[in-house]
Amino acid sequence: LISRLFAEEYGSEFVFVTHYPSKKRPFYAADDPEDPRYTLSFDLLFRGLEVTTGGQRIHDYDTQVAKMLKKGMNPEDFAGYLMIHKYGTCPHGGLGLGLERLTARLLGENNVRETCLFPRDQQRIEP
C-alpha cells in the first residue's frame, strides 16, 4: 500500500522507511540521540517488498553493553563482538541488499524462489 501511494504521489516505486522502534531492531542498531525509542535505521521498499535493511551501528562499548542488557542479553556471551567496541571502532553503518528479492520484483515474479539459483523449501534443503 505505501509503495503504491508513493508511486502515485511521487512517481517512484522505491520508498525509504526510517527510524524503526528500537525494540523492533537488533541489539547493534544505534538509537536516535534525539529520541532513543527509535533507531537510526531504514528499510528500502520496492513495489511493496523490503529489498534492503540498514542503518547506523553502535560503536561505543558502554552503549552497546547497556543495549544488550536492556534486551535481556548477556554481554559475556558476546565477548568477541564487544572487543571491537572496547578497543576502538569508528562510527559505521551497514546494509544488506536482497538481490533475489529485488530481481523477483523487477521480473514480476510472485515468488522469490523463481529468481534463486538454488531455492529452498520443505522438500529441498540441498542443491
For the regions a language model picked out, list residue spans one by one:
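A translation/RNA-centric and nucleic-acid-associated enzymatic feature enriched
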Residues: 1-127
